[in-house]
Structures are given as structure tokens and as C-alpha cells.
Regions:
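Conserved S-adenosyl-L-methionine
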Residues: 1-2
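Conserved phosphate- and dinucleotide-binding cores of soluble alpha/beta proteins
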Residues: 6-154
Length: 154
């Protein structure tokens, strides 16, 4: 088995991940972001990180995630998101603050119907079950209420 890692531009975190996996003895290959959808048929699962996971299962992630997730869906390859609890937002994706111009060039909203499950420290959840997780973790709502006005005023 081999791990295919996207470069993940512009920061290129994939380069670090491939180096760490290789150092651990895991066969890993770096794939250009634009090439990843074409390589999805070679995989058993697509594992994504997320910048934000909304209560309805919508994901905010880097540009290029939607084509990868759609290619996976079309190939019958499950898409799984791994995210820390702190990245959960207590509102649905439709209520996400508008992205600033520079953010629109870097991020996009991935619909929940492209995601099979989300893995957190609290366990694995179907996108439809995230609301119950968010409701159990009060600091998510409190933190969001503090930062949402800042995002709206930029």
C-alpha cells in the first residue's frame, strides 16, 4: 500500500507529510494538487483535513478540495475528514461569514453530501450527526460568538 499526498499549495504541507511518513517507513508519494482527482481511482479512501467543519457537515478547506471529493464520489471512493473539535463551527455552512477576497482565492466550501464521515477526538460522525456533537461541546458556540463579529467587520 502507498499513501498519495497532495502538495497542498500554497503552504505545501504535503511535502512535510510525505517526509514524515517516509521517515516512519510508510511508502508515500507526493502528488500535485491538480493531478489528485485523476489519481483517486488508485486509492481506497480520500482523507482530508479541514479548516472548519460546520454543524451541517459542510467543510471549509483549500481550493481544489471539491474536484477531489467529486472525483472520489464518482469513483466510489469514500471521503473522510479528520478535524480537531476546535475546528467545529456551531452554524451551518450557509451561515458561514463571507470570505474576504484573499480567502476566496484559498478556500472553498465542500458540501456535506461529498463527505462520508468526520473523525474527531470524540469519535467518528456522519455529517448529519455533527449537530449533536456541536451541541454537546459548549465552548464551540461561546468561541464562535466571540469571533464571528470580528469576521463580519473586516
Amino acid at each position: 500500500k502507498k499513501v498519495l499526498c497532495t502538495v497542498s499549495k500554497p503552504v505545501e504541507e504535503g511535502r512535510t507529510l510525505v517526509a514524515e511518513l517516509s521517515e516512519a517507513g510508510i511508502d508515500a508519494e507526493l502528488v500535485e494538487d491538480a493531478d489528485a482527482p485523476g489519481r483517486v481511482k488508485e486509492t481506497d479512501v480520500v482523507l482530508l483535513g479541514a479548516d472548519t467543519v460546520f454543524r451541517d457537515g459542510t467543510i471549509c478547506n483549500k481550493i481544489g478540495t471539491i474536484p477531489l471529493a467529486r472525483a472520489a464520489r464518482d469513483a466510489g471512493v469514500p471521503v473522510v475528514v479528520a478535524a480537531e473539535l476546535i475546528k467545529l463551527a456551531p452554524v451551518p455552512g450557509a451561515q458561514a461569514p463571507d470570505l474576504a477576497d484573499f480567502e476566496r482565492e484559498l478556500f472553498e466550501l465542500i458540501p456535506a453530501d461529498l463527505i462520508i464521515e468526520v473523525v474527531t477526538e470524540e469519535g467518528t460522525f456522519a455529517p448529519d450527526d455533527l449537530a449533536s456533537l456541536v451541541d454537546r461541546v459548549p465552548f464551540l458556540r461561546e468561541g464562535y460568538e466571540l469571533v464571528a463579529p470580528l469576521a463580519a467587520n473586516r
